[in-house]
């Protein structure tokens, strides 16, 4: 493809330079990017000015109606999006402005720029698809709309701005090795998948925020509040997930490892990042329907049980009595906090699944009063799902 583009560019340079001296002035110059675009068709038969030499990405896409953007070069962020039916101002590539972009009815866009070069301006007109983000680079702003999910950034790269509009996703996703952050937004928001081997964090709640469980040394952030808030990306494997969703649609950013989660924002505020591994998950999501993410691997109890008037109680961990069972209606459950293992505050509102049970068995939803042993407020995951919490 590159060779073909280069050859076309060379031919265009030789033939088009003479013809398009006059025409090129009328047209807005297009961006040069690695591959010059051949003259695109214009009103009558007018050859476009000479394309730039090879090694320069072409810039401007055709104008009018819907114009698909060319693929962005790898490793470079895409250029500015197109504008209505107005011809775009040409981008000036490094020292080599390309000839004017095609004008008139249909103008196919020139060849995409070679890798490592930013593409020219995106197409103009009603629909403007955003170019694909280059690999290894944070993507530009995600599409707008209440349903668009923020793009996942590549490992080690902060994610670009989340989609705009009702939903504002929280901060950057975790580094590589961490599952990405924000779940899709909209009526139902599934929680991000919990990392393997760790009980998932807080169960979803009604419109009431649950009082955060703050075990000593690892305070859990407050639960999300408001309508539908998709939870941010789940922490890396072995880490409990951070705070649940909050008002509006806001995906939560990934929590940094080894840090307790702060209180999540409320209402239309973006949620605080999730807590790192070894830390109890933040508050469960609240609001409309928030399905929780996938359950943890076998042998680990899943965090929040499903919502609904009835709250099934999860199996207690072996040898540890569980704290008080979940309560129906809008009753907050007072968790028994045995020394070294205080359970966080129970959920509130009609459908409040209890916090994550200890990892005894599949996905126990609510902890039960386990057999003789130490009365545990929140059951400790005997299998190492979660480190024991210091006494409050």
UniProtKB/Swiss-Prot annotation:
Residues 19-392 are annotated as: Disordered. Disulfide bonds: none annotated. Pfam families: Pro-rich (PF15240). Residues 48-83, 91-144, 152-205, 213-243, 252-266, 274-324, 354-392 have a biased composition (Pro residues). The keyword Ubl conjugation does not apply. Residues 1-16 form the signal peptide. Glycans are attached at residues 40, 87, 150, 330. Residues 34-47, 325-334 have a biased composition (Low complexity). GO terms for cellular component: extracellular region. O-glycosylated. O-glycosylation on Ser-87 is prevalent in head and neck cancer patients. O-Glycosylation on Ser-330 has a 5 times prevalence in head and neck cancers. It is found in: Secreted. The modification Phosphoserine is found at residues 40, 92, 150. The modification Pyrrolidone carboxylic acid is found at residue 17. Sequence repeats lie at residues 53-72, 73-92, 93-112, 114-133, 134-153, 154-173, 175-194, 195-214, 215-234, 236-255, 256-275, 276-295, 297-316, 317-336, 338-357. This is Basic salivary proline-rich protein 1. It comes from Homo sapiens (Human). The gene is PRB1.
């Amino acid at each position: 493809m590159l060779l073909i583009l280069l050859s076309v560019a060379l031919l265009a340079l030789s033939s088009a330079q003479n013809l398009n001296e006059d025409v090129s002035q009328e047209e807005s110059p297009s961006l040069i990017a690695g591959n010059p675009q051949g003259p695109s068709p214009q009103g009558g038969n007018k050859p476009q000015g000479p394309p730039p030499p090879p090694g320069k990405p072409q810039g401007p896409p055709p104008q009018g109606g819907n114009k698909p953007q060319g693929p962005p070069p790898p490793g470079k962020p895409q250029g500015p999006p197109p504008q209505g039916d107005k011809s775009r101002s040409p981008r000036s590539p490094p020292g080599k402005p390309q000839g004017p972009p095609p004008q008139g009815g249909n103008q196919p866009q020139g060849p995409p720029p070679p890798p490592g070069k930013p593409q020219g301006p995106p197409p103009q007109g009603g629909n403007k698809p955003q170019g694909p983000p280059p690999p290894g680079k944070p993507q530009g702003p995600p599409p707008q709309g209440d349903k668009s999910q923020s793009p996942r950034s590549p490992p080690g790269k902060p994610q670009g701005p989340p989609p705009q509009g009702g939903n504002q996703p929280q901060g950057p996703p975790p580094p590589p090795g961490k599952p990405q952050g924000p779940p899709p937004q909209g009526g139902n928001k599934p929680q991000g998948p919990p990392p393997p081997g760790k009980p998932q964090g807080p169960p979803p709640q009604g419109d009431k925020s649950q009082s955060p469980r703050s075990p000593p040394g690892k305070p859990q952030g407050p639960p999300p509040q408001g309508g539908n808030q998709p939870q941010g990306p789940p922490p890396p494997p072995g880490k409990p997930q951070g705070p649940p969703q909050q008002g509006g649609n806001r995906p939560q950013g990934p929590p940094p490892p080894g840090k307790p989660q702060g209180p999540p924002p409320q209402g239309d505020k973006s949620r605080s990042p999730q807590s790192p591994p070894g830390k109890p998950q933040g508050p469960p999501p609240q609001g409309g329907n928030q399905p929780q993410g996938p359950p943890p691997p076998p042998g680990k109890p899943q965090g929040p049980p499903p919502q609904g008037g009835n709250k099934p109680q999860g199996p207690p961990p072996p040898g540890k009595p569980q704290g008080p069972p979940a309560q129906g209606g809008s009753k907050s459950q007072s968790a028994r906090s045995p020394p070294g293992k205080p359970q966080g505050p129970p959920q509130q509102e009609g459908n409040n699944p209890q916090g994550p049970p200890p990892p005894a068995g599949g996905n126990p939803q609510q902890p039960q009063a386990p057999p003789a042993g130490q009365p545990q407020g929140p059951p400790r995951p005997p299998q190492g799902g979660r480190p024991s919490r210091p006494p409050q």
